[in-house]
Amino acid sequence: MQRTIVVGDVHGCVDEMQALLRQCGVVRGDRVVLAGDLVAKGPDSRGVVQLVREMGALAVLGNHDDFCIDVWRRRHQAEARRPRRWLLDTLDESDWAFLESLPLFLRLGAEGEGGPEVAVVHAGAVPGVPLEEQERDNLLSLRSLVGGSAPSRRLLMRWPWAAAWRGPEHIVFGHDAVRGLQQYPLATGVDTGCVYGRELTALELPSRRIYKVPARRRYAGV
């Protein structure tokens, strides 16, 4: 049975990503998937993009990837260049084309024999709405369900969207570094804040084993 490794938000932390893949013991035939936010905030966004491309890994689009793509598209406007100039000057045209090609979600097939279908999104999904019908902003930025039902990108600790998710898919997601590792029957959150000096995390499927490596240092504030 093919093993799948889903990696949380890397944010340019290529050294930690390489260490995590070594800890997972990734070999030919394993499927590696990134849960978005490959770039921005960390030390080596281009290194992450190049590693993902060289490995033939899969990835979904994250909100920071999306923001940086928008800045890149407006790169000839002086005001657009200032905040992300270092990133614009580092990634080449083929790197940007790769980021632009990333989907909002991926369906990975069944989680083992007789298991639920696995899907990867960056942020979240509103319960009861098929993935194909989810709003783009929710897939990229959802964190909470106000009162258990109204979608919000705000961090409301009492109402994580994942706690209300009942499937049918097992969704693996990133984005929510403050809550950290989240483990529910049909939703697993793997953003554990590596770029903020904490850990980089991966979920192995179908075993649901968790792998973690510590950040080398704190690269950015929350």
Could you describe each region identified by the protein language model?
Residues 11-15, 40-42, 66-69, 127-128, ...:
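Active-site environment of divalent metal-dependent phosphoester hydrolases
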